Design a protein with these regions (language model features):
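Short alpha-helix immediately C-terminal to the canonical SAM-binding loop
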Residues: 12-16, 98
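Short strand-turn motif at the edge of the Rossmann-like AdoMet-binding core
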Residues: 56, 84, 91-95
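A short SAM/SAH-binding and catalytic strip from SAM-dependent methyltransferases
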Residues: 48-69
Length: 155
């Protein structure tokens, strides 16, 4: 059985996820309300199998790129807690964040891009887990936005 841990600083999102897990009687879901900058305090080295980054704040203002969850400083954090060969996934509607992520990964020596797509719904989904949409994903799709996806590993 896979376990899932939702991490967010916003209490309302944690509450909604926890309420859904209770209603659906999910015994493999847990939630952690914390700043992502502190993620290493909650997981031991090589404890995590996969990380999903779904529709994060793209931090588009000048000087905020280092706060993007796909910036090199976050990749360093993820690399510490991921198991060898662990996967990372990014889903976004934002082209700036998507392109920034690709550029960051190409420049990050330990990164290996396994799959990238600037419009995942224009062809059959490469990963069954992609069929589960977040609230924000559904909202962006209703507005006609394309959803971008990157799957990668940090060796």
């Amino acid at each position: 059985q896979q376990n899932f841990i939702g991490v967010d600083i916003k209490g309302a999102r944690i509450w909604k996820g926890a309420k859904t897990a209770l209603v659906q009687q999910l015994d493999n879901a847990a939630f952690l309300r914390t700043r992502i900058e502190q993620i290493e305090l909650f997981f031991t080295p090589e404890e995590v199998d996969e990380i999903w980054i779904t529709f994060p704040d793209p931090f588009l203002k000048k000087g905020k790129a280092n706060r993007r969850l796909s910036s090199a400083n976050f990749l360093d954090r993820y690399r510490k807690i991921l198991k060898k060969g662990g996967l990372l996934h990014l889903k976004t509607d934002d082209p700036t964040l998507y392109n920034f992520t690709l550029e960051t990964l190409w420049a990050y020596p330990q990164a290996e891009i396994l799959y990238m797509d600037s419009d995942i719904y224009s062809r059959p989904l490469p990963n069954p887990a992609l069929q589960f949409n977040t609230y924000y994903e559904d909202m962006h799709l209703r507005k006609g936005k394309t959803i971008k996806y990157v799957q990668f590993r940090l060796n």
